[in-house]
Amino acid sequence: SDIRIIRKILDTLTEFNEQGVPVKGTWDTENFFSLQKILPEYAPDIIDKMKERVIKYGDENIIMGYNNGALSAMTEDEFCESINLAITNPDGSGLEDIFGTCEKIVRPQEVMFTPSQVSLYNKLGIKALCLYYSCVPFDAFRTIIPKLSDEEAFNPLTYTYNGESMTIIPTYSNSDVCDAGCLRAW
């Protein structure tokens, strides 16, 4: 199950840290289902370990959106509410509520992106988006920009739409490994 996998990842990261390897996690967890409902009931130890790792090893929490909704399909009000509630909310399941801090970086649900929302991300103080520059066509940033060089494809870049810019952090998925044939070839 996902809970066992997350526990194993947390334990593995901590084992490496204890061996002197400076690894840290970047977590993108939606709030309503995972941080407010499921984990507190079935795996509160995961939240405790994540909190500990934020303090002790510098793990980061980035925004996904409050309720796992498709940010790219939301109205302006829904979009703003989802981002704001993901940061802090009356139920205490915001990233700042739980972890005391969060990075103003968004990895939207299914990494879906709508260029017209760049202005909304900027309005909310979001510093960057993590988007697949990937071979997955339904949610790939790659489909709306010119091909990037290898250097550009593995480093943050600036995306501009209608005069507004923001930083995009290209990310990848297991489908990219499959597209290359194997991890070594990728």
Per-segment meaning from a language model:
Residues 1-56, 114, 129, 134:
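Active-site beta->alpha N-cap acidic-glycine motif
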Residues 19-25, 57-60, 100-103, 124-127, ...:
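Loop/turn elements at helix/coil->beta-strand transitions in domains of secreted/extracellular proteins
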Residues 32-34, 67-72, 135, 176:
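A short, flexible beta-alpha/helix-coil linker loop
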Residues 37, 59-77:
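Substrate-binding cleft and catalytic face of glycoside hydrolase catalytic domains
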Residues 64, 106, 169:
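Conserved, mostly hydrophobic/aromatic
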Residues 69-95, 161-186:
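Alpha-helical scaffold elements lining the catalytic groove of polysaccharide deacetylases
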Residues 77-123:
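A conserved hydrophobic secondary-structure block that centers on an alpha-helix together
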Residues 110-186:
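Active-site-adjacent pocket scaffolds in enzyme catalytic domains
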